[in-house]
């Protein structure tokens, strides 16, 4: 005979721990433009040269003017705008909406802030302290695109930032990247100015993607010229081929 009132076992509810938010769940755009067009160009110059440098590596990410999340408390209020430029090594390549340290597994290895009248004091004090004591960024630099004499670099040593001294060539070396940050007098996006960009330890500028394409085109033209001269020496008209 079937029991009309079967006894069912009542189980205690299981509460799963709340997982921290990911980059897809966090704000990644504050709608605020950079301080000036030159600031934007300087950021793009740094990013572009870093991207060509990263082509030689299987890992690495470079970003700029994007949110950097370093604590769960920070997610409750948008109280910190991300670095103007940063590099992270030892991580898979690929696009990110924002940099979420607990999702990616590590923070930036190098940060550069571009100074402006409205941000310089913060970049030199509270942000520097944040990068040093909370996020613990190994190397931190700042530069003023309109006052190029105002630049500095710091390296984390013993838990504190120590100034990076300019070398004999006037550059600030990055031990993390194995590159040097140099001042470059030149034209970028129709602006003639003093910029900062990366150079190799031998002093060769790391090219942007556009510069790299020009170099490739020039090399191809030189090869074609050598071939044409060789054919002419053999009595062959290269234009007739």
What are these regions (language model features)?
Residues 2-33, 70-83, 90-110, 114-134, ...:
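C-terminal interaction segment
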Residues 36-81:
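Acidic-basic catalytic patches of nuclease active cores, encompassing PD-(D/E)XK
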Residues 61-63, 141-144:
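A structural signal for short, well-ordered beta-strand segments and their strand-loop junctions
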Residues 138:
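Short acidic/polar active-site loop segments enriched in Thr and Asp
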